[in-house]
């Protein structure tokens, strides 16, 4: 897998500075700059780190490409929480790291679900259920008997998660019955996907990915480039393909049956002028 790393040095002075050396989609860092700054402030404040009597020099690096849809913001928040924990010997367990990262994610999402920071904190294949009340979210680590070969396509477009979420919320308020029906189908789809993952049934997983993408189109989360990349993936052998993350840009993932197909999808997408890479899930 790919990672974001963070390093914190303590020097004389007060406040903090940041040096962001992460590889990124062109324009991503510029568009997300205000959110990055606020997320750092959120994490520092949550962990009650003193910046009145000392100055923090924060740096981010790693091989995870910062792009919409890959969980880059969560990786940044989680890596910062871990670096602060190490630098100041805060003795935080993963649950506390996750809580700090969630506070950072609020700068990007307004009201984040918590899934991205949870995936970033714990890693692996995760079953996540958000608690819509005041209780805790549910998180289980799953084991699939089969590795999932994924081709990731980058649209090169950076969308604002906050704006997309606000648009969808407005549409839901305008047409609650339509959205309740879609969300009901969504719940069934996710339960079916969990069963298929536990069996390693990639044919079913691929079919469910395709259905999921159609739902995302219905709620206006997908964009033209997302749809184009989904079609390219399917035309070149993907069992299933869908956007991932914010949508209206960002990334598309395609599920391949074997490494040769995975390679083919990536190569064709690159020939079309987009960046693409390979990963494995499970």
Predicted features along the sequence, with ranges:
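Short, conserved phosphate/pyrophosphate- and ester-handling motifs at nucleotide-, phospho-/glycolipid
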Residues: 73, 245
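A sequence/structural signal of beta-propeller blade repeats
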Residues: 94-95
């Amino acid at each position: 897998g790919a990672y974001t790393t963070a390093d914190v040095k303590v020097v004389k002075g007060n406040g903090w500075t940041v040096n962001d050396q992460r590889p990124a989609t062109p324009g991503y860092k510029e568009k997300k700059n205000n959110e990055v700054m606020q997320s750092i402030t959120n994490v520092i404040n949550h962990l009650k780190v003193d910046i009145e009597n000392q100055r923090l020099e924060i740096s981010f690096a790693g091989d995870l490409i910062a792009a919409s849809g890959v969980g880059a913001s969560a990786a940044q928040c989680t890596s910062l929480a871990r670096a602060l924990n190490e630098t100041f010997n805060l003795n935080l367990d993963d649950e506390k790291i996750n809580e700090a990262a969630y506070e950072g994610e609020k700068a990007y999402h307004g009201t984040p679900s918590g899934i991205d920071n949870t995936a970033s904190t714990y890693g692996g294949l995760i079953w996540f259920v958000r608690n819509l009340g005041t209780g805790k979210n549910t998180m289980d680590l799953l084991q699939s008997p089969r590795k999932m070969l994924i081709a990731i396509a980058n649209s090169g477009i950076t969308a604002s998660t906050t704006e997309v979420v606000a648009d969808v919320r407005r549409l839901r308020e305008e047409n609650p019955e339509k959205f309740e029906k879609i969300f009901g189908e969504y719940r069934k789809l996710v339960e079916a996907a969990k069963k298929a993952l536990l069996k390693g049934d990639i044919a079913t997983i691929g079919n469910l990915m395709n259905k999921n993408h159609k739902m995302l189109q219905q709620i206006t989360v997908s964009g033209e480039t997302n749809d184009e990349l989904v079609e390219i993936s399917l035309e070149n052998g993907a069992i299933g393909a869908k956007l991932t993350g914010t949508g209206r840009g960002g990334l598309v993932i395609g599920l391949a049956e074997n490494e040769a197909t995975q390679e083919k999808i990536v190569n064709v997408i690159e020939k079309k002028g987009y960046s693409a890479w390979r990963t494995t899930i499970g």
